[in-house]
From Swiss-Prot:
One of its GO terms (molecular function) is GTP binding. This is Cell division protein FtsZ. It holds the Pfam family FtsZ_C. It is found in: Cytoplasm. It comes from the Bacteria. Homodimer. Polymerizes to form a dynamic ring structure in a strictly GTP-dependent manner. Interacts directly with several other division proteins. SUPFAM superfamilies: Tubulin C-terminal domain-like, Tubulin nucleotide-binding domain-like. HAMAP family: FtsZ.
Length: 452
């Protein structure tokens, strides 16, 4: 009997990450990443403009809509861009096969990027690929029509991506100066994509003490909606903390606060001199920004010999509620007991229904008399304070922080012989005459009455 024994093939299993540039802006972003010699990712560019496609540094190129546009571009029409992508669906699908994750980058507001990017994202999702969109919005000087086109494209794109990162070009003015060239400004926007891709690929290919697998990354980024990416590098004293601070404060992104994030991916990379305490300091600084106790925070740390003396921190925060605003603490003038107008604007205050205030629930104020004497008689510093769930106003801590309205309501509740609050629906309809004559800013916006 003859036995044929073969040695098992040495198959290397690793996730495949693809960066897919769409249109002129997407192709330029890919060119910048190739120039930067980014490792660990495949590149594909697709365009309706044959001339632009010819000048791309990328090897894998797709001419979108040969019959639809004849290589002449989409003419700033998203409808034409979408038709071109649909015509080239087989080529797009072929270029994405075997990919585990794809970053789709495009400029919103034009024809090819706005129209084709959602089609490409849909194909990627049909293939079961983790799909991340990183797109830009137009400058203000490009006009309202282009901005509306971009917004419509974003709505369409968001239906098909797991995670979406939006970079408004107008925010480039936050970091540019009078000497910044037009090309350099766009490169700054492309660096957001570069940092995000590098943060993921480093975790895959770089050696480290705490390695992550692709399943970890997918858990943080799958079906998460809006997101932010940031990276920071620093050297010298407190380099880890400074790098973390830079990573979580990206000036190019709107709503870049990590408050409310449902998933956070942290990658800390350094040379052989990176210490345990530095890794701990950087990771904890980022964790402080996340106020969601149920957030899925995944942490990895890798080594890069080229980063001797430097620590790099990359952050991807996903599932961010873009409508959530930071909590503001209104300063109270001790003399007038009012809120100066210049300390806030209406956008800081989120209006809350009175029924949602726990301290008022099911409590009757029918026979409560509000007088200054009752307030002075019953108020002490150590008494339990009235808790109002209003984002714009923090819980009062001392006399100087209490507006006259909140103080009077609290005093009235204290004056009710400390009875147990029974649950009844309450609506506060009237204020005393003194309060009517007080500054309107004494009254929280959600209870403010219109003056006659």
């Amino acid at each position: 009997m003859i036995l044929n024994i073969k040695a098992p093939e040495n198959i290397v299993l690793k996730p495949t990450i693809t960066v897919f540039g769409v249109g002129g802006a997407g192709s330029n972003a890919v060119n910048n990443m190739i120039h930067a010699n980014l490792q660990g990712a495949n590149f594909v560019v697709a365009n309706t403009d044959a001339q632009s496609l010819e000048h791309s540094l990328c090897i894998n190129k797709i001419q979108l809509g040969v019959s639809t546009t004849r290589g002449l571009g989409a003419g700033a029409s998203p409808e034409v861009g979408a038709l071109a992508a649909q015509e080239s669906e087989n080529e797009i699908r072929s270029s994405l096969e075997n990919s585990n994750m794809v970053f789709i980058t495009a400029g919103m507001g034009g024809g090819t990027g706005t129209g084709s990017a959602p089609i490409i994202a849909r194909i990627a999702k049909e293939l079961g690929i983790l799909t991340v969109g990183v797109v830009t919005k137009p400058f203000h000087f490009e006009g309202g029509h282009r901005m509306k086109t971009a917004d419509k494209g974003l709505i369409e794109l968001q239906q098909f991506v797991d995670t979406l990162i939006v970079i408004p070009n107008q925010n480039l003015f936050r970091i540019a100066n009078e000497q910044t060239t037009f090309a350099d400004a766009f490169k700054m926007a492309d660096d957001v994509l570069h940092a995000g891709v590098r943060g993921v690929t480093d975790l895959m290919i770089m050696p480290g003490l705490i390695n992550l697998d692709f399943a970890d990354i997918k858990a943080v980024m799958s079906e998460m909606g809006k997101a932010m990416m940031g990276t920071g590098e620093d050297s010298g004293e407190d380099r880890a903390i400074k790098a973390a601070e830079s990573a979580i404060s990206n000036p190019l992104l709107d709503h870049s606060s990590m408050c409310g994030a449902r998933g956070v991916l942290i990658n800390i990379t350094g040379g052989p001199d990176m210490t345990l305490f530095e890794v701990d300091n950087a990771a904890n600084r980022i964790r402080e920004e996340v106020d969601n106790i149920d957030a899925n925070i995944i942490f990895g740390s890798t080594f890069n010999p080229e980063l001797k003396g430097i620590i790099r921190v990359s952050v991807v925060a996903t599932g961010i509620d873009a409508d959530k605003v930071p909590k503001y603490k209104l300063a109270i003038d001790e003399n007038t007991n009012t809120v100066p107008k210049e300390t806030y604007n209406e956008s800081m205050i989120q209006h809350t229904q009175i029924e949602e205030i726990p301290a008022f629930n099911n409590y009757s104020t029918e026979n409560i008399e509000i007088t200054d004497s009752s307030i002075k008689q019953n108020y002490t510093e150590n008494e339990q304070e009235l808790r109002l769930h209003v984002n714009a106003v923090n819980k009062p801590e001392n006399n100087s922080q209490k507006s006259s309205f909140l103080w009077k309501i609290w005093g009235s509740l204290r004056a009710s012989n400390n009875q147990t609050l029974e649950r009844k629906n309450v609506i506060v309809n009237t204020l005393d005459q003194d309060n009517k004559e007080s500054d309107i800013h004494d009254i929280p916006a959600f209870l403010r009455k219109k003056r006659d």
